[in-house]
């Protein structure tokens, strides 16, 4: 058999012998019949035993046995019983043999009406076949099939169906069956609740009924009458609400003991306090709690009843205050849990109506009552406690939601924490202190936020109750504040406020470090804060800690953003282009390219020969010559501001400065003019390539990506996770300039073109990272082998990357003097970085160590492995680019000759740059000898 999962009842059908009385089993829970019980009948004992058996059910298998025994005991000639339980939302399932009850015909009629239905058998179409063959109509004239739907009125649905093949019923048997039906439904509810809670200790089985008085033992009438009354009471105890259940029990006790009122004082789990929610026939609006001390505490300890004469004056005063009347008589009886053998409540009866004292018989009545009702009472209380916990969990989730919506302002968040903590714990006052170095600071109170720092409260982090909690990290529950050595009552004396009790708990962050303390003062509906309040505070503090930590972090991030924004504003202010500058630039209009130099569009032209002051106009001239200004309707003043802003955006390291950016942009112009790029790329792609060349090294610091990561710079923190640290920074600076007022040259673009332009710029600028070039080199070779396909988008992306890299290294395509001068500038930068790395305690690469680097060999290696393969690919794709490859190869030969000369002669000193400043000659390619001086004018080329 075993226990079914979820709501599925597994049942067995069986042929039964003649009905036999059932053994009394376990503890019972009864439902009140709809009609008054008839006079005692000979079968009353059998019915009572059957209902007691149902009352002891705690699992599925026990429920099945109890249902069979109960129906066999109260119904005539029971032949077959099938029990079905709702499985899921609609299926009614039986196990033995496994089958589902079809909800058709008579069964469907009974389920819809939710009323028992008797018939001379079920239709063949209503049955699943063989399992229910015995129930097919017609049956014998003196037998019938009962279809009994058990409807859960709270859920508004049928929870189970019982099919019984039995004889015709008499009136007494009809009444007994009603009782069995209701008790079966209650037993089913209890089993389902126990299943949801998980495994618990099973209640002990009831041994024998309590011994009656001497009068009871003289005859069975008194015992039967009392048992009938308790049976009727148990039939009413189907409530899941503890207050409603207490009302019924207390009314029964008042009637049986002739007391003016009764109450149940529930004992807390920690045995420290009593609570009362129901007095007589009245449910209190607020639960009353008071300490479990004095004589009442002795009752819990000794498990013995007491009367009024045994109470102290303090106990009497406490009870009279709760009841609102004077006590003339009282009987207090401990209610003991069968599961734990501990006192769970005190049943109290007050002021006998006849003015007499309570007797031993009254005590026996109370004990007899709770002998049968204590289990259902404790189960209901436990269920209600779990419901309360569920509500508290839901409240905590709502609290968490409220807290996490106020992360943008710490003060507002703390005010929300105070409000929620006070509401959850029913405290009069709440204060929150944040730990600031060695002090606890409070500037948010119940009354609001203190803006003036002179009014905020600061206390040492190791003093007082809050300081103790902050130091130890442990919660502190103080029932009597004035009796605690850490409490300072001077504030109470000066304000007139009385602090009765305190619950102080730490607030910790994710690392379990104390970041604050919350202090709750004066429990409103209890003598002090309970263990439940401690658990609630502990759970609440987790949400507080996370929200406060994130709010403080959010504040720091905001402050950092404000500082960054301010720094950007300052940078943009100093980079700001005055009206005079761009007006002067455009005063005579845009100069034609031919006016700059007759060879300006030739690969042999050296852009570094142009004075820096003339470079901005040269940029405008190139853009106009490529017809981008007209095609994209670019506003000339905006373009002028943009060019001047980009120029100012470059720092002044030896190599990566504005003149490098201008040289790279000029080479892009040369590619456009000499290689007919319009046959390979779209206009917007060429435009993006040119603008990217201008911006590709914005704000370069003269150090590479590896240095940024090793030095843990701000740039590395921003971009290291994505790679290409400096390149991403260059792109970000370009976007910052475009976002500067009056500098957005793409302002007239459509949304689609604007987004595409920015995407192209990002990809092209990131392609200047040589690590990126090496990753795509095989793809570039493959594209060169198969030929460029203008319709292939991947070829467009690869070609743009190749063109950008060739522009970036274009100094290597110029004459020897330019190449040698550029090498000097580059290695000055490298050696400066190497010096910084040495100062940091790191070992620089050989090429950046001025004491180890041999520039000719380094340049030869660079030419052979990086520059020459790039321009070889360019030559394969564009035959007109052959002269570029040849010039790079020529420069490589020059470096070989220089290396050979100094291998024989030796370097002038241990400083690797010295030889570049020395006058020497090497044979030129045409056999002549030309002077080489790093400081000579580049115009000589």
From Swiss-Prot:
Specify which residues bind Zn(2+) according to the UniProt entry for this protein: 660, 696-697, 808
The lipid modification N-myristoyl glycine is placed on 2
Q: Which family does it belong to?
A: Belongs to the cyclic nucleotide phosphodiesterase family. PDE2 subfamily.
Please list the residue ranges annotated as the GAF domain. Answer: 241-377, 409-548
What is the tissue specificity? Widely expressed. Expressed in brain, with high expression observed in the corpus striatum. Also expressed in heart, placenta, lung, skeletal muscle, kidney and pancreas.
**What outcome is documented for mutating residue 858 to M in this protein?**
Decreased 3',5'-cyclic-AMP phosphodiesterase activity. Decreased 3',5'-cyclic-GMP phosphodiesterase activity
Record-annotated PDEase domain positions: 578-902
Q: Which SUPFAM superfamilies match?
A: GAF domain-like, HD-domain/PDEase-like
Write out the ranges of the annotated region (Disordered).
16-42, 196-221
- What EC number is given for this enzyme? 3.1.4.17
Q: Which cofactor does it need?
A: Zn(2+); Mg(2+)
Q: Where is the active site?
A: 656
Cited function: cGMP-activated cyclic nucleotide phosphodiesterase with a dual-specificity for the second messengers cAMP and cGMP, which are key regulators of many important physiological processes. Has a higher efficiency with cGMP compared to cAMP. Plays a role in cell growth and migration.
Q: Which reaction does it catalyse?
A: a nucleoside 3',5'-cyclic phosphate + H2O = a nucleoside 5'-phosphate + H(+); 3',5'-cyclic GMP + H2O = GMP + H(+); 3',5'-cyclic AMP + H2O = AMP + H(+)
Q: What is known of its domains?
A: The GAF 1 domain functions as a dimerization domain. The GAF 2 domains binds cGMP, which acts as an allosteric activator.
Pfam (any one): PDEase_I
Question: What is one GO cellular-component annotation here?
Answer: nucleus
Q: How is its activity regulated?
A: The 3',5'-cyclic-AMP phosphodiesterase activity is stimulated by 3',5'-cyclic GMP.
Alphabetical GO biological process terms: adenylate cyclase-inhibiting G protein-coupled receptor signaling pathway; aorta development; cAMP-mediated signaling; cellular response to 2,3,7,8-tetrachlorodibenzodioxine; cellular response to cAMP; cellular response to cGMP; cellular response to granulocyte macrophage colony-stimulating factor stimulus; cellular response to macrophage colony-stimulating factor stimulus
Quote the record's binding site residues for 3',5'-cyclic GMP.
431, 446, 465, 488, 499
Which InterPro entries does the UniProt record give? GAF (IPR003018), GAF-like_dom_sf (IPR029016), HD/PDEase_dom (IPR003607), PDEase (IPR023088), PDEase_catalytic_dom (IPR002073), PDEase_catalytic_dom_sf (IPR036971), PDEase_CS (IPR023174)
- Subunit structure and binding partners: Homodimer.
Name of the protein in question: cGMP-dependent 3',5'-cyclic phosphodiesterase
Which taxonomic lineage does the organism of this UniProt entry have?
Eukaryota, Metazoa, Chordata, Craniata, Vertebrata
Gene Ontology MF terms in the entry: 3',5'-cGMP-stimulated cyclic-nucleotide phosphodiesterase activity; 3',5'-cyclic-AMP phosphodiesterase activity; 3',5'-cyclic-GMP phosphodiesterase activity; cAMP binding; cGMP binding; identical protein binding; magnesium ion binding; phosphate ion binding
Protein residues bound to Mg(2+): 697
* Cofactor descriptive note: Binds 2 divalent metal cations per subunit. Site 1 may preferentially bind zinc ions.
């Amino acid at each position: 058999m075993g226990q079914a999962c979820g709501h599925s009842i597994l049942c067995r059908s069986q042929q039964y012998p003649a009905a036999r009385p059932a053994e009394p089993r376990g503890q019972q829970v009864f439902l009140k019949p709809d009609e008054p019980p008839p006079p005692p009948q000979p079968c009353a004992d059998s019915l009572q035993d059957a209902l007691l058996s149902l009352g002891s059910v705690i699992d599925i298998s026990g429920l099945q046995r109890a249902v069979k025994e109960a129906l066999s005991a109260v119904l005539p000639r029971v032949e077959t019983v099938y029990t079905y339980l709702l499985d899921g939302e609609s299926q009614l399932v039986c196990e033995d043999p496994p089958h589902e009850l079809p909800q058709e015909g008579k069964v469907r009629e009974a389920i819809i009406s939710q009323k028992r239905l008797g018939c001379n058998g079920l239709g063949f179409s209503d049955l699943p076949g063989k399992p229910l063959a015995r129930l097919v109509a017609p049956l014998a004239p003196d037998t019938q099939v009962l279809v009994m739907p058990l409807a859960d009125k709270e859920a508004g649905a049928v929870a189970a169906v019982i099919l019984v093949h039995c004889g015709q019923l008499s009136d007494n048997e009809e009444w007994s069956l009603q009782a069995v039906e209701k008790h079966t439904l209650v037993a089913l509810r209890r089993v389902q609740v126990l299943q949801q809670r998980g495994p618990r200790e099973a209640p002990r089985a009831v041994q024998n009924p309590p011994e009656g008085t001497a009068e009871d033992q003289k005859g069975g009438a008194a015992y039967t009458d009392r048992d009938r009354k308790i049976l009727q009471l148990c039939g009413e105890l189907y409530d899941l609400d503890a207050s409603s259940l207490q009302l019924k029990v207390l009314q029964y006790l008042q009637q049986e003991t002739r007391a003016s009122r009764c109450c149940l004082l529930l004992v807390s789990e920690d045995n420290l306090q009593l609570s009362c929610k129901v007095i007589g026939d009245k449910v209190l609006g607020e639960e009353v709690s008071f300490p479990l001390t004095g004589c009442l505490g002795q009752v819990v300890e000794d498990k013995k009843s007491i009367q009024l004469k045994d109470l102290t004056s303090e106990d009497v005063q406490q009870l009279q205050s709760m009841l609102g009347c004077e006590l003339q008589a009282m009987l207090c009886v401990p209610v003991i849990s069968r599961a734990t053998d501990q006192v769970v409540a005190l049943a109290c009866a007050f002021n006998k109506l006849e003015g007499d004292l309570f007797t031993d018989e009254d005590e026996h009545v109370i004990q007899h009552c709770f002998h049968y009702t204590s289990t259902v009472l404790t189960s209901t209380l436990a269920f209600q406690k779990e419901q309360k916990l569920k509500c508290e969990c839901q409240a905590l989730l709502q609290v968490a939601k409220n807290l996490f919506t106020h992360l943008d302002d710490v003060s507002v968040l703390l005010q929300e924490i105070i409000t929620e903590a006070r509401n959850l714990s029913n405290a009069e006052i709440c204060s929150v202190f944040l730990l600031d170095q060695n002090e606890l600071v409070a500037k948010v109170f119940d009354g609001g936020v203190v803006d003036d720092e002179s009014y905020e409260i600061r206390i040492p982090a190791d003093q007082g109750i809050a300081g103790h909690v902050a130091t130890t990290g442990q919660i502190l529950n103080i029932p009597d504040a004035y009796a605690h050595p850490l409490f300072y009552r001077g504030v109470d004396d000066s304000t007139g406020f009385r602090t009765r009790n305190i619950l102080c708990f730490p607030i910790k962050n994710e690392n379990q470090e104390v970041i604050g303390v919350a202090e709750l003062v004066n429990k409103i509906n209890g003598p002090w804060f309970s263990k439940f309040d401690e658990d609630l505070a502990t759970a609440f503090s987790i949400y507080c800690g996370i929200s406060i930590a994130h709010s403080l972090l959010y504040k720091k991030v905001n402050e950092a953003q404000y500082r960054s924004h301010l720094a950007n504003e300052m940078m943009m202010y100093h980079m700001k282009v005055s009206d005079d500058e761009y007006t002067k630039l455009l005063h005579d209009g845009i100069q034609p390219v031919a006016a700059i130099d007759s060879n300006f569009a030739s690969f042999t032209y050296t852009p570094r020969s142009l004075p820096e002051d003339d470079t901005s106009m040269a940029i405008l001239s190139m853009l106009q010559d490529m017809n981008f200004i007209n095609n994209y309707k670019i506003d000339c003043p905006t373009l002028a501001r943009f060019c001047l802003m980009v120029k100012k955006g470059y720092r002044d390291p030896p190599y990566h400065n504005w003149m490098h950016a201008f040289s790279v942009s000029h080479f892009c112009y040369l590619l456009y003019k000499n290689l007919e790029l319009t046959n390979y790329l779209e206009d917007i792609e060429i435009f993006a390539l040119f603008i990217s060349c201008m911006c590709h090294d914005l704000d370069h610091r003269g150090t590479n990506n590896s240095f940024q990561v090793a030095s843990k710079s701000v740039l590395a923190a921003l971009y290291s996770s994505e790679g290409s640290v400096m390149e991403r920074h260059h792109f970000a600076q370009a976007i910052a300039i475009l976002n500067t007022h009056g500098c957005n040259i793409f302002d007239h673009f459509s949304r689609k073109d604007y987004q595409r332009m920015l995407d192209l710029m990002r990809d092209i600028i990131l392609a200047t990272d040589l690590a990126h070039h090496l990753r795509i080199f095989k793809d570039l070779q493959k594209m060169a082998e198969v030929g460029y396909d203008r319709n292939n988008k991947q070829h467009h992306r690869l070609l743009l990357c190749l063109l950008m890299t060739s522009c970036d290294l274009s100094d290597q395509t110029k004459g020897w003097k330019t190449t040698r001068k550029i090498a000097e500038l580059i290695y000055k930068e490298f050696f400066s970085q190497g010096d910084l790395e040495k100062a940091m305690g790191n070992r620089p690469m050989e090429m950046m160590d001025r004491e180890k680097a041999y520039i000719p060999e380094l340049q030869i290696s660079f030419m052979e492995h990086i520059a020459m393969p790039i321009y070889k690919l360019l030559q394969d794709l564009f035959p007109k680019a052959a002269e570029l490859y040849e010039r790079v190869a020529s420069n490589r030969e020059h470096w070989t000759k220089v290396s050979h000369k100094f291998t024989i002669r030796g370097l002038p000193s241990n400083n690797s740059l010295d030889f570049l400043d020395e006058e020497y000659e090497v044979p030129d390619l045409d056999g002549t000898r030309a002077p080489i001086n790093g400081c000579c004018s580049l115009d000589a080329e």
